[in-house]
């Protein structure tokens, strides 16, 4: 506003009118239309005749959508996401391409059957292989840097026979040779204090999960998969023909519904499913730049370099 001889009262009135008008516009923007208020064209394109509905636009949700598209090239697929971005752990995790540190596997073998442990490792490896087929390494900044399992001063080192057993199983089950080895030079390499030993895994690596989510999203758009962001599924009901999905914007109908919310699935299932609380700490730039991915305490703690 340019003052051309106008009084301060006049200026204040003009500013007040402009501010009030802008505020009113913002208020209108914040109030989103309900589904039943959309136009015919909007309902036809975005809400009607969807075969598959997917709750959650994270790694699992978008991967599920892409797998469905591969099997059903012409069916309508829709992903419903409660946030304006994926709000779960997909873009908050550390970005480890991992399948099992040796102390983690030892802990698993002590608490579940041997068959189940190696079945779990097989699923992890299969998932990583599928991911690398679907997304190029440069699209998710994948680095085959390996990983280190760090043993604290008050922890017991692994027996050489146990490390040999892990390598034998990895070779027999998955064709991977010399996966685990002790790294006698880790202290000189990294300068860590408080650790007495480290075991190296030659096949693990790191991923930029932000880039990965972006790559999957672009693939979904190219595959004609629809997204409804800022749409929270509150509950659903089903019959023999379809599933009615209720959101804060109204209800819509799909033939099949996939719940891909992982830790948040307790909102939909009457089970004792509770997500574990996790905390991420981000340091300032370190003088001694550490490259790689690292685990400790049976895989419950882990850290890596970024940037």
Language-model features and meaning:
Residues 88, 92-122:
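Glycine-rich active-site loop/strand segments that organize a redox cofactor
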Residues 71-92:
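Glycine-rich FAD pyrophosphate-binding loop
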Residues 5, 10-52, 70-71:
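Extreme N-terminal leader/targeting segments of oxidoreductases
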Residues 48-50, 247-256:
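Core beta-strand elements of the Rossmann-like FAD/NAD(P) dinucleotide-binding domain
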Residues 103-109, 133-218:
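Flavin (FAD/FMN) cofactor-binding and adjacent substrate-gating region
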């Amino acid at each position: 506003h340019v003052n051309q001889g106008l009084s301060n009262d006049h200026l204040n009135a003009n500013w007040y009118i402009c501010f009030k008008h802008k505020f009113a516009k913002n208020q209108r923007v914040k109030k989103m239309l309900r589904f039943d208020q959309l136009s015919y064209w909007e309902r036809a394109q975005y809400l009607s005749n969807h075969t598959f509905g997917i709750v959650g636009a994270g790694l699992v949700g978008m991967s599920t959508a892409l797998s469905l598209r591969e099997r059903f090239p012409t069916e309508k697929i829709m992903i419903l996401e409660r946030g304006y971005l994926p709000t779960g752990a997909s873009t908050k995790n550390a970005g480890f391409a991992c399948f099992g540190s040796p102390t983690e596997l030892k802990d698993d073998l002590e608490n579940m059957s041997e068959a189940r442990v190696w079945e779990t490792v097989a699923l992890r490896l299969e998932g990583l292989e599928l991911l690398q087929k679907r997304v190029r390494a440069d699209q998710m900044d994948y680095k085959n840097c390996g990983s280190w399992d760090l043993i604290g001063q008050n922890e017991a080192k692994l027996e050489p026979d146990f490390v040999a057993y892990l390598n034998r199983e990895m070779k027999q089950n998955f064709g991977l040779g010399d996966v685990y080895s002790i790294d006698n030079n880790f202290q000189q390499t990294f300068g860590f204090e408080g650790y007495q030993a480290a075991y190296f895994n030659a096949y693990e690596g790191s991923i930029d999960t932000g880039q990965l989510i972006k790559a999957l999203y672009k693939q979904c758009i190219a595959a004609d998969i629809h997204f409804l962001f800022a749409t929270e599924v509150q509950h659903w009901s089903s019959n023999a023909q379809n599933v009615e999905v209720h959101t804060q914007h109204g209800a819509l109908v799909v033939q099949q519904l996939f719940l891909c919310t992982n830790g948040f699935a307790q909102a939909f299932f009457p089970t004792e499913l509770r997500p574990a609380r996790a905390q991420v700490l981000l340091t300032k730039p370190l003088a001694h730049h550490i490259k790689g991915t690292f685990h400790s305490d049976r895989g419950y703690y882990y850290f890596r370099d970024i940037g």
